[in-house]
From Swiss-Prot:
The lineage of its organism: Bacteria, Bacillati, Cyanobacteriota, Cyanophyceae, Nostocales. It comes from the Bacteria. The gene is nifW. This is Nitrogenase-stabilizing/protective protein NifW. One of its GO terms (biological process) is nitrogen fixation. May protect the nitrogenase Fe-Mo protein from oxidative damage. It comes from Nostoc punctiforme (strain ATCC 29133 / PCC 73102).
Length: 105
């Protein structure tokens, strides 16, 4: 990795992040889980920023690189449904009676 934090801040696409950190990736995995990988990566970056505010830019980029690898690995080993990163996975259906709620008299 030879980029700067300013270059990092200009990145948008998942592929750009992987290229910035010189990380190999399976395009099929990224195509299927793109938003989920980026969301998880964002969560990890937020944790790094909150827990280690005094890191140098180089140290921060190194931590971000590890965070991207970790986020990518999560979706190799599990599914988006299992991770439930987005609101749609956590919303409870309205006006639905589940089978476990039905009892016989």
């Amino acid at each position: 990795m030879t980029g700067t934090i300013d270059e990092f801040k200009k990145l948008v696409d998942a592929e750009e992040f992987f290229q910035f950190f010189n990380m190999s990736y399976d395009l099929e995995v990224v195509n299927v889980h793109r938003l989920h990988i980026l969301k998880k990566f964002s969560q990890y970056m937020h944790e790094i920023d909150e827990n280690s505010p005094d890191l140098s830019q180089e140290e921060k980029l190194n931590q971000y690189s590890l965070a991207l690898q970790k986020a990518y690995q999560v979706f190799i080993e599990s599914t988006a449904y299992e991770q439930k990163l987005f609101k749609v996975f956590n919303d409870k259906p309205k006006n639905v009676v589940t089978l476990t709620e039905i009892t016989s008299d």
